[in-house]
């Protein structure tokens, strides 16, 4: 397999860290973006670590193209996200707004900044959640998280349509219920989740661009 340049946001822990690990093991070059690095990420020795990268801070990500020099990205993975549990009683407007900024607007800003650094035939990956599916909402609550992920899905579909003439495909993937800090340790292993995600990334093309898939290959409803 030809060595690829892969840029991953939120790569210091959880799914982002495991994506970094597995792509490096395949011989790819990985550019790791995070607000603060971790000993685990440093131990993996990615191609570059860009620390101090806050997807909400335009100034912190504005110079990414120049920092990448002439490197062109094959795969951009928007993984950074936040979940703040809520219900009607605990609903906090600021928390809802924060989740919209991080989960929906943040990835869009990253794409805008890095558009000139993408190869002509590149892949944009958005790690979303089936909790952003309106049709699949069987339990309610999590207002801010659900709404922010639904917004991310809408953004990703628009990008799929806007960027298809350039040969850029867009993957909208649910990683499954994964045992991470965000899920309280409940769910499948991070390794299993990422193995499935990589299969979805490898099979992504312009024909299935803009569709919503579970890491196990199941197409999910909007």
Features from the language model and the residues they span:
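Structural signature of the Rossmann-like NAD(P)-dependent dehydrogenase/reductase core
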Residues: 8-9, 78-79, 123-129, 169-174
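C-terminal helical subdomain
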Residues: 172-175, 180, 184-222
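A short hydrophobic alpha-helix cap/turn motif
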Residues: 24, 118-119, 161-165, 178
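Catalytic loop of short-chain dehydrogenase/reductase
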Residues: 82-100, 108, 120-164
């Amino acid at each position: 397999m030809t060595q690829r340049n892969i840029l991953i946001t939120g790569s210091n822990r959880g799914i982002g860290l495991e994506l970094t690990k597995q792509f490096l093991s395949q011989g790819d070059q990985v550019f790791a973006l995070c607000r603060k690095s971790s000993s685990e990420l440093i131990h993996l020795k990615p191609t570059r670590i860009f620390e101090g990268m806050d997807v909400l801070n335009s100034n912190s990500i504005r110079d990414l193209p120049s920092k990448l020099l002439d490197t062109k990205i094959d795969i951009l993975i928007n993984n950074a996200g936040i979940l703040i549990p809520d219900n009607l009683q605990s609903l906090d407007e600021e928390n809802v707004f924060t989740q919209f900024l991080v989960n929906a607007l943040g990835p869009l800003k990253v794409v805008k900044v890095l558009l000139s650094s993408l190869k002509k035939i590149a892949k944009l990956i958005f790690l979303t959640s089936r909790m952003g599916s309106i049709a699949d909402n069987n339990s309610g609550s999590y207002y801010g998280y659900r709404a922010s992920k639904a917004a991310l899905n809408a953004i990703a579909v628009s990008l799929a349509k806007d960027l298809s003439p350039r040969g850029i495909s867009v993957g909208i993937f649910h990683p499954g219920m994964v045992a991470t800090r965000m899920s309280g340790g409940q769910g499948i292993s991070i390794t299993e989740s990422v193995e499935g995600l990589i299969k979805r990334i490898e099979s992504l093309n312009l024909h299935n661009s803009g569709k919503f898939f579970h890491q196990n290959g199941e197409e999910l409803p909007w």
